[in-house]
């Protein structure tokens, strides 16, 4: 009998749809607009969220119909997660793909969807909706915190 949680005992490819969906911690960081530098390919996060991101819950306000409103929304799949370099370092999909464990604040570990926010990992209170700015000014909103959240825990583990 295997007493390990599914994210420790299965690969991404072996997960059921409900297991896959539950790997999302609800941080909202993947829904922040990013800028890609054309010549280098470098990707920079901004604090500007997709128009569909609910700033309080950090979940998509129209998940099932998101492509009707945001045709270029990137759907994370078992096949493409290994190739998406911009996933935040705390992303459950990225962690499991890399053979790492989920953080203590992940809802699957804590049992509470609010811990991702209480731990300061999510976009809650740190992002602005793209409908509230002139997108020509997107460069003014470049931030590094989506790539540095959770580093304190990583430092403690080292």
UniProtKB/Swiss-Prot annotation:
It holds the Pfam family CxxCxxCC. Belongs to the UPF0260 family. This is UPF0260 protein RL1394. It comes from Rhizobium johnstonii (strain DSM 114642 / LMG 32736 / 3841) (Rhizobium leguminosarum bv. viciae).
